Structure formats: C-alpha cells, structure tokens
Swiss-Prot record:
Function statement: Shows weak transcriptional activatory activity.
Species, as recorded: Homo sapiens (Human)
Signal peptide: none
Gene Ontology CC terms: nucleus
Protein name: Zinc finger protein PLAGL2
Annotated GO biological process: chylomicron assembly; lipid metabolic process; positive regulation of intrinsic apoptotic signaling pathway; post-embryonic development; regulation of transcription by RNA polymerase II
Phylogenetic classification of the source organism: Eukaryota, Metazoa, Chordata, Craniata, Vertebrata
One matching Pfam family: zf-C2H2_6
Length: 496
C-alpha cells in the first residue's frame, strides 16, 4: 500500500535553511483532536502557519529582502508577494469605493470595511461598563477597559486566569492571549526609533512617531487653517469641530462639474475631427485645413495663417495613383497667397508647376489640337494671351482623377511582372519620357537629334505655335553613355 504525505515531514528539511530563514517544522501538540498534519511555526514570534509557503514571507524581516516595493515616492514599503503589494496600492488611491451602509464611512479596501461592519453587528451583545457607562462591541476591548479600571485602583491581576503582573502594559499584553491572539513574543517592540529610545511594534508606528521629531504637518483642514502631522488627528478634528459642515456636504446636491468636463472633452474632439478623418463636402468646400485649429492654442511662436478657402495641397494627392477622388470638389478661385513657410517637396502638388508628361497630355486634348512637333507648322495665333488663358482654364478644369491616370499611363513599368521570362537580353536603358511615349536611341543618333531639337526654335520662331518652351538642354552623360541601337523597352523585349 502506497502512503502519500500531505505535507513535508520534518526530517527532510535542511538544517542550513532553518538557520538562515529562522523557521522549522514542528508537529502540532497532541490533544483531543490530534492529527498527523504538520504545521510550521516561526521561531522568532511563535506564529503558527499551515504550510511553509505562508511562513516564508513572514520570515523576511528586512525591507530589502522583500522583492515587491511600493512605487509611490514617499512610501518606501516593501512586500513579499504581489497580492499584498496590489492590496496596499489601493490605500494610495483618492477614491474609497467601499462604503458602510450604516454610518456612510468610506474605506479603500474591502477587508477594512468588513472589519468595520463588526461594530454594527446587531447579533453582537453590547458590553456595558458599570463604572463609567461605556459600551464595547468586542470582548477584548471590554476586558482591556476593565483592566485599566483595575490598574488605576492598584490591582494588576488578570480577571480570567488570576495571574499577577508587574505593570499595566504587561497586563494589557497578557489579555490578548485570552482573545485568541498570539501573546508575548509576537508583540515584541522590535522597531526602534532613530531619534529617541522608544520602540514600536511595527514600522508603520515608527513612521507615525517620526512626526514628533520632524515637525512636519502635511494634513491641512479644509475648513480652517489648522494643520496636523497625522491623518487620524485631522479626522478627529473634523468630526469634533466641523460636524455642521460635514452635514451640509452630505445634504448638498451633486454639482455639475462632471457635465462641464464632458462637454469640454466633446468640444476638443469636434475640433480635431475634420483633421483626423475625411470631412464632408461642405467642410471641404468652405473651410481650409490651415485654419481648422487656432494656432495660438499650442504655442505663441507659431504665426496664425488666414483661411484662404482652398483645401490643403496634400488632401487631393495623398490618394494612390489611379484612384478616383471620392468627393466632387468644384474649382475655387483663391486670392494671392503668401509664400509657404516650408518648401514643398517632390510629392507636393502645385497647379502652376506641372510635370512635362501632364502638359503633353493636356495639350493633346486642348481645342485647336496644339502640338509640340515642329514638323507640322500651324498658323501663329495673333493673341498669345488668349491662348495662355485657355490653357489655364483647361488645367483648372482637369479633375485629379484624370491627372493620376495621365501619370500612371506614362510611368507604368512591367519589369516586376515579366521578370520570370528567361530572356538573355541586354539591360534596358533609362527611357526618355516625351509626351507619354517611351523611346530608345542609339549613341550615334542621340547627339544629332539633340542638335536638331535645339536649333528648331531658333530657325522658325513663329511657326511652332503660340507656346515656346525654350531651347532643350543636352542630356547628362549618365543617360547618353549607355545607349544602344538595338535596345528596346522592356515591354517589347518580353515579346520578341
């Protein structure tokens, strides 16, 4: 038959661990309800525990041995487990969510409320002192009160076991043994004060006592100018001296501070919504993005720009090429604007500086069939200003969708789609985009062609049309050095 141990036997424990930690396993005293269960007992305080896991945190007296410390600035408390740290963190919160249903007292922790509810227990008998008339809810408080009366008369004997003591303090400590609490060594004053000879039971009592030496009074009464060094002294002062003010606070209605804070939050969200998401047609047509937020709100060094009524340049062109704009925006004439503070990059869109590919695609659709070729001469227009105005209207009338389609048609590259074909052909040279066409020239043909193009505007100054683009500059050596007569674009190489 196999025997299973419910706890660790005492003979398995390491003697070295007992010396370092200060605890050992001792069997429970035999009695009427003798059991084989082994319990742990602290050698220092004599506190019994059901297992070693509960005794181990108890045997860590120094704060540096407790791994979980409170992150608050002036707290300095450390704990042996995460649970005790989280339970302690509730005391630093300004909110007290646990309220007593009988006296409206608030508590940070639920166990504190549970201990407080024992004072309102109707099943508990009220212990009445016949000498002074005080009532007590606990037997320990009642016995301690009777011991104080007996000590004042000179009797230092326990009324339960008739044991005599030398001082009143020793008698009060002995009374805890009759209230099912650990007496004697468990309540030894082992925490001394660094400034005087007094000793205390816990480190909390030492910190509370330090107010006597430092003179700090951090607790201010909200009804008067009086300050206190301890919070319990402030609470006692408020209940004693300002009881009428406390009653007025309880009877006052709820203020509207929460509603005002909610409305301010909504207003901020409404200010930011046109910038963070796509606005409607009315907002796009009537309001400009530079004037959405008040510029002086976040810094006085930023100059405020007047609202011009033109949408931001990045709004229309941040969409991918080939996608149509979801909103139908009508062209709006804008007055003369100041130069921008920051220079726009290559991704910005300016109507007066269009790429050459867009100009060629627009010229192909203009009424009158304007052409850039000097091989087909046309009669010169007597009014070049009218033609320039006609070109400006055509540029403004073009929608962003057509602009993106023209850009896509001239810059499509199929090399990443046809890269799997086993073609051992010479590499493609950088194409020269002229009017949306991709052409390749040999090295022998490139130089005479450039010379011809440069001489054309000088030979026929008035026969090329109303537009004059000036002499063409020669290509840099990066683009002309590697040209070949047999080179074709990649799209045609794939289908040779």
């Amino acid at each position: 038959m196999t025997t299973f141990f419910t706890s660790v036997p005492p003979w398995i424990q390491d003697a070295k661990q007992e010396e370092e930690v200060g605890w050992k396993l001792v069997p429970r005293p035999r009695g009427r309800e003798a059991e084989s269960q082994v319990k742990c007992q602290c050698e220092i305080s004599g506190t019994p525990f059901s297992n070693g896991e509960k005794l181990r945190p108890h045997s860590l007296p120094q704060p540096e041995q407790r791994p979980y410390s409170c992150p608050q600035l002036h707290c300095g408390k450390a704990f042996a487990s995460k649970y005790k740290l989280y339970r302690h963190m509730a005391t630093h919160s300004a909110q007290k969510p646990h309220q007593c249903m009988y006296c409206d007292k608030m508590f940070h922790r639920k166990d504190h409320l549970r201990n407080h509810l024992q004072t309102h227990d109707p099943n508990k008998e009220a212990l009445h002192c016949s000498e002074c008339g005080k009532n007590y809810n606990t037997k320990l408080g009642y016995r301690r009160h009777l011991a104080m009366h007996a000590a004042s008369s000179g009797d230092l004997s326990c009324k339960v076991c008739l044991q005599t003591f030398e001082s009143t303090q020793a008698l009060l400590e002995h009374l805890k043994a009759h209230s099912r609490r650990v007496a004697g060594g468990a309540k030894e004053k082992k925490h001394p004060c660094d400034h005087c000879d007094r000793r205390f039971y816990t480190r909390k009592d030492v910190r509370r006592h330090l107010v006597v030496h430092t003179g700090r009074k951090d607790f201010l009464c909200q009804y008067c100018a009086q300050r206190f060094g301890r919070k319990d002294h402030l609470t006692r002062h408020v209940k004693k001296s300002h009881s009428q003010e406390l009653l007025k606070i309880k009877t006052e209605p709820v203020d509207m501070l929460g509603l005002l804070s909610c409305s301010s939050t909504v207003s901020v969200k409404e200010e930011l919504s046109p910038v963070l998401c796509m606005a409607s047609r009315d907002v796009m047509g009537t309001k400009a993005f530079p004037g959405m937020l008040p510029m002086g709100m976040y810094g006085a060094h930023i100059p405020t720009m007047p609202s011009t009524g033109v949408p931001h340049s990045l709004v229309h062109n941040t969409l991918p090429m080939g996608m149509s704009y979801p909103l139908e925006s009508s062209p709006i004439s804008s007055p003369a604007q100041l130069p921008p503070k920051y220079q726009l990059g290559s991704t910005s869109y300016l109507p007066d500086k269009l790429p050459k590919v867009e100009v060629d695609s627009f010229l192909a659709e203009l009424p009158g069939s304007l052409s850039l070729s000097s091989a087909e001469p046309q009669p010169a227009s007597p009014q070049p200003a009218a033609a320039a105005a006609l070109l400006d209207e055509a540029l403004l009338a073009k929608s962003p969708a057509n602009l993106s389609e023209a850009l896509c048609a001239a810059n499509v590259d199929f090399s990443h789609l046809l890269g799997f074909l086993p073609l051992n052909l010479p590499p493609c040279n950088p194409p020269g985009a002229t009017g949306g066409l991709v052409m390749g020239y040999s090295q022998a043909e490139a130089q005479p062609l450039l010379t011809t193009l440069q001489a054309q505007p000088q030979d026929s100054p008035g026969a090329g049309g109303p537009l004059n683009f000036g002499p063409l500059h020669s290509l840099p050596p990066v683009f002309t050095s590697g040209l070949s007569s047999t080179t074709l674009p990649r799209f045609h190489q794939a289908f040779q």
